[in-house]
Amino acid sequence: MFREYKIYKFFEQVKQETYKVFWPNKKELIASTLVVVATVFIFSLICLVLDYSIHNIMQLLLTIGK
């Protein structure tokens, strides 16, 4: 019985905390999403360029050694 009370108390506290959460409006949510998508795109391009460069450098070094 004590265990059931602890579970009940836990979920009551969770419910209380959800009322304290700041929920963004649609405009803020869209702006944040665009920032995340743009950041991921930029870092993906950086990784692509670095990967391509390292690949070409390694190919050059391997062909020089032959």
UniProtKB/Swiss-Prot annotation:
Subcellular location(s): the record lists:
Cell inner membrane
Q: Is Protein transport tagged as a keyword?
A: yes
Q: Name one GO biological process term.
A: protein transport by the Sec complex
* Any one annotated GO CC term: plasma membrane
Q: Which InterPro entries does the entry link to?
A: SecE_bac, SecE_sf, Translocase_SecE/Sec61-g
NCBIfam families cross-referenced by the UniProt entry: secE_bact (TIGR00964)
Assembly behavior: Component of the Sec protein translocase complex. Heterotrimer consisting of SecY, SecE and SecG subunits. The heterotrimers can form oligomers, although 1 heterotrimer is thought to be able to translocate proteins. Interacts with the ribosome. Interacts with SecDF, and other proteins may be involved. Interacts with SecA.
Q: What does this protein do?
A: Essential subunit of the Sec protein translocation channel SecYEG. Clamps together the 2 halves of SecY. May contact the channel plug during translocation.
Supply the name of the protein.
Protein translocase subunit SecE
